[in-house]
């Protein structure tokens, strides 16, 4: 690039990392396949449980993530008849301007940007979480990292800032996991319904093969995609907004079911309000509604968030088990939320 200084450092191709951390023929592969099938059944209504994707806003400390996973596994077992619990394991953070972009981009929180190490740490952590018997869900922010990690994800999301991107719609069309598209940051549902329709079709596009070579990828389409309501200029989780969104889905000839994100604009960026969102969703479910098939929740061992700037702050001084990105519910409130949702599902299904 003329007049611009750039530097490109090659890293190992995806197949090298997959060979080093294999899952073929293991219980991890079985769990992921089974969970994907269960999520598809929840999507099509043949499983009447609620999908709950819950976990830290982002992963910055693998040890804390594993501690959280062990506690969440107990909740997964406890509510297995009413909830399909999947741990939120986000390694990449979209940024409106600048900031820490996640564990893959800067795994050591020191602006060394060891992306090769970030991919290795992420793959190891995903395997460790799945080995517990706890499936993982994540956001797909770029089109290369899924080649390194996609086989370990049971459910995926395309964020509000990328739902309208053709590249991400093409990516979703080739992923094996069910994928949720968030409404736009302004609350626009149409871009999400358009994305679902686009991802359902086959595409040809440039990407990277698992051997590291640039390739033309042909996909058959992913028909297991859905809308995630995350709020916009105002929250959109209440029964009236859910019904309006389902009308738009029906008008687009799509299934009239969706997921609600309890965080982000729906909680007005106030983590405690996630409980209020969950109560509203629980009331809708308890009244007999099947329109909301799942929820997303930002949760960690400890409530809130702590400020951290890579290159300026000391990572060793961070409080254990607390987010360094969006504020999260603490563990006690997280278990209350799960119990609330479980009771609502049980009440609906008993009726």
Residue ranges and their predicted role:
Residues 14-23, 219-231, 318-319:
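Gly-rich Lys/Arg/Thr-decorated short loops/hinges at beta-loop-alpha junctions or inter-strand turns
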Residues 62-74, 97-104:
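Glycine-rich loop at the start of a catalytic domain that most often binds anionic cofactors/ligands
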Residues 51-64, 326:
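Conserved phosphate/anionic-ligand binding catalytic regions in large, soluble enzymes, centered on
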Residues 82-237, 241-242, 264-265, 269, ...:
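Active-site-facing alpha/beta catalytic cores
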Residues 301-347:
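Internal helix-turn-beta structural module
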Residues 2-9:
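Short, small-residue-biased leader/transition segments that mark boundaries at the very start
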Residues 37-52:
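N-terminal glycine-rich anion-binding loops that anchor highly charged ligand groups
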Residues 55, 260, 330:
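Conserved, mostly hydrophobic/aromatic
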